[in-house]
Amino acid sequence: MEEQTFASRLNDILGEISSVVWGPYLLIPLLFGTGLILTIRLRGVQFRKLGTALRHGLLDRDDEGGKGDISQYEALTTALAATVGVGNIVGVATAISIGGPGALFWMWGTGLVGMASKYGEAFLGVRFRTTDAKGGISGGPQRYLAAGIQNGFGKFLAWFFAIAAVIAAFGIGNLTQANAVSAGLEDTFGVDPRLTAVILFIGIGAVLVGGIKSIGKVTAAFVPMMIVIYLVGGIIVLITHAGDIPAAFGMIFRDAFSGTAATGGFLGAAFIIALQMGFARGIFSNESGMGSAAVAASAAKTSHPVRQGLVSMTQTFIDTIVVVTMTGLVIVTTDVWKLGPDQAGVMTARAFSAGLGSDWGGMIVSVSVVFFAFSTILGWSYYGERNAERIFGTWATTPYRMAFTCVVVVGATTELDLAWTFADLANGLMALPNLVGLIILSGLIARETKAYLDFDPKLKASPDQIDQFLIDSNNPWRTAPNKMEAYLTPKTKTTNSEAKN
């Protein structure tokens, strides 16, 4: 009983801290402001170049002449594996059950401006990446904050991020996800949580032994499949409730600014609650501004930071504008959002059951949760590993992988009432230093992005042309990635017009 009381008190304390971090005076304006600043300085690159980015990332897949540990497509699927997780199913339901349908609008908002933030952090991840003692590529906020902001403040931000990322990896990327897998298999198929723990331990451990190359191959194989299965199920539900779709959109846009009145088990929500829940669950879902995806992006085989930045920003589009929208519309059109916050965990399953039948609907959601959560564990294991290396050195790789794999067992076999509150707080602590860094380095991002896109607007330049461009612009990025700290103010000269053809 004392343990339950202590857990309840701890949850309340963490909840209070999280409400301040995610409140209207700190992360919400900082998230939106950073995305807006980058959107303006990059001249809406997420809208102008979305088609080009989708083609380059999903169709071209490989960047000829690029150096890195994994292909740019594998980097994208690794980042998608980490983001398309429980937040897309349970997180969306939680946001709507507390903030009302209007929360979905603000989740879209985090996605649209967040695409610019995602572009910026992926650009910087590649721009300032280094080669570690074992010959692997290492990058992310823990690197570019220190290298790009060349003073004590930059180092402070980098270390703050690294510590928060290691902690968050065990929360958002492990405990909550393993618990979701265990609960899903037990509820749908009656699998004993202890058996799930053993399966996860073996499966995760087998993949992590191979490092990022193994993670990239696994995620590239099953991430597209799991997303397609979920979307097809959602489309069928929407077809069966097609007449309710216009009213659902009207409710989403209206309630985003006016709040939602109490109805059924829903307690009602003011505008600020819809805004707060939309932003908090939005970043939990797409991780834009958190800096996590920059770690995966930095490992990609790419011939220029701009090219990988564009590919990486499609991750937020797929996650929020596609998958989150599907979940939200299914929940709103079937009216299950009125059940109330205490039913958030089963809302999506009930919504799918309303259109597909109880057996098929519940099975698709449960299987999706299992796959989404498993993939999230893989992606976040790499994020945490790279930040652990930043703190302790490359010797920490093996102990970290062992610890991360063991914690999966804890998550699968233990009730985790604190998990979501802890995950929200950890996400916020990661985002704070990264967002500050993105604002400070926004000039560098905008300057080099403009220079490259003026030279190669359709991303069709050959490796030789890009090499010449780097020489002409006095940019040693590809030939001397470990010396980027000394290069912050490039003088762009005449570009190679052949790339435009």
Regions found by a protein language model. Name each.
Residues T34-T39, T110-G135, Q142, A146-N179, ...:
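Helix-loop-helix module between adjacent transmembrane segments
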Residues L42-Q46, N88-V92, P101, F170-V181, ...:
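Transmembrane helix-loop junctions in multi-pass membrane proteins
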Residues E64-I98, L124-R127, A133-Q142, A146-G148, ...:
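Alpha-helical membrane segments and immediately flanking helix-loop junctions
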Residues V113-E121, V198-I212, V223-G243, Q276, ...:
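Selective recognition of specific alpha-helical transmembrane segments in multi-pass small-molecule
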Residues E121-R129, A133, I235-M251, G259, ...:
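Extracellular/periplasmic helix-exit of transmembrane alpha-helices
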